[in-house]
Amino acid sequence: MPPTLSCIRLSTLLDARFFHSSLPAAGAIALHACGVCHRNQAILFAARSPEPRHTLATLWRAYRPSSRVLSERRMIVRPTGSRFRAFADPAEEPGGSPGWDSPFLAAIHFIYPASVTSLRPLPHSHALARLLAWSTLPFPDLELTHQAIATAHVIVTRVPCTDLEFHPGRRVLDMVAPATD
């Protein structure tokens, strides 16, 4: 029986490491990403560096006050039937809740600072490579690593993934979530 994600209390780094290592057994992965809940849907902005994630979180807070930043650091993506839900990593954000009320995942954007903002859809193979590169994988457990790869593959085939080069400003938000606030 796979582990449940419902009652999580992480008090040490070792607890967090065990939690991240157990995610693939539950069909979930941890991703270095800023997560935003916009119109009851999660939008993830994945980046290796924390600076662009923080920049995006700041833009959401400034220009889309009705949206909620779930986390600037790491998000958990887990399956619910044929869809995925996203919630803040409880190791990073004490309020991260894996409950059934966490928002469904609408898109994953792999973000890069740039002088001009552009959005480019990714083929599944490129999205899979990026998702794995920016995930917390359960090394050195080979079986759980295979489960993580399989989960990531399902995610990129069901959730739109893009490369998002962005210049900080309102335009980047208009591209990924047109304003109607």
What does each model-identified segment do?
Residues H32-C34, H38-R48, R61-D181:
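Glycine-rich, often acidic-flanked micro-motifs
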Residues C7-A42:
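A short mid-domain helix/strand-loop element embedded in enzyme catalytic domains
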Residues L5-S6, L23, G95, F139:
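A general structural-boundary detector
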Residues E51-R53:
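Conserved glycine(s) of the Walker
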Residues L56-A57:
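Post-Walker A alpha-helix
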Residues M1-S21, R158, D174-D181:
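Charged, amphipathic alpha-helical linker segments immediately N-terminal to NTP-binding catalytic cores
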